[in-house]
């Protein structure tokens, strides 16, 4: 079995708004009991290259409700029927051109008609039927998708509450808009992330997030206590890349060798809201040949948290967080090698001071630009 871990400590990067994502505040409509105001939050994450085209990622948070039943006769004075909330939900509208008017975006949500159905294959799934979206988002990715199929545990807070025989509708309440450089839009293909080989060593990334929550809250029971007393600590792992196994028998492939590789890559980590809460990694230096498929031509890669830890991602829908630290871990790629070797840890990963905070929904924007009733 593997022995103890070898760790290379590093001072924590200075605190900054770039290391956090804040939650949407709870704001109730004055004229309606129990109604939340629609809100929008805006943020910019740019690559630093002035020639890089800007795009917007639109991500939505809201609630699934049963579709209201209609009566035989309806008059103009009939009150609008609103069914109780069943559970919370997230759905990404994807990338598209830059959008300018926040107030217009909120008003346009009234034109949205998205139905929700539950199904199953080898596991439970959710099917979003896109009947109508606002014309404002016609150039975003969602406009090309009439049906969106997804794992229920990644996009629905409590999928067990959705039952057969009921028609459901998704009501958008919170709109998260991230203006970013087009070069940031890169994810590694899942088959490449899942592949393991005895010919390479795997480089994993651990990101420690300080989640905003009370010590006695239910979510705190599934996380570590924060020694600084500012919340709770959650660890999330991603497969970052592979490194070719060195065959020079006269060379020692230890923590010094690994630290040299990571130092030359000049890794920086940040957080944003793109496909939901997302970890962004940038390699600003030399990328080894075996690692190049895991980054785009400008050294960027995005890792949506819901792909690695759906439960943590759903926690961040309603809680803000801050990147506390990040480390790269060298392991054997195939399971036989992994079981027989120590983890070598490189903790000198930079945290981008301009993009290391996540402001979730406490249900608080990066910046609250406008709000209106969720009719």
Curated annotation (Swiss-Prot):
Location in the cell: Virion
InterPro entries, sorted: Matrix_C, Matrix_N, Matrix_Paramyxo_C, Matrix_Paramyxo_N
Signal peptide: none
GO molecular function: structural constituent of virion
Record-level GO cellular component terms: virion component
Main location: virion
Domain of life: Viruses
GO biological process: virion assembly
Pfam families attached to this UniProt entry: Matrix_Paramyxo_C (PF23765), Matrix_Paramyxo_N (PF00661)
The entry's keywords: Viral matrix protein, Virion
Record's function text: The M protein has a crucial role in virus assembly and interacts with the RNP complex as well as with the viral membrane.
Family per record: Belongs to the morbillivirus/respirovirus/rubulavirus M protein family.
Name recorded for this polypeptide: Matrix protein
Protein species of origin: Mumps virus genotype N (strain L-Zagreb vaccine)
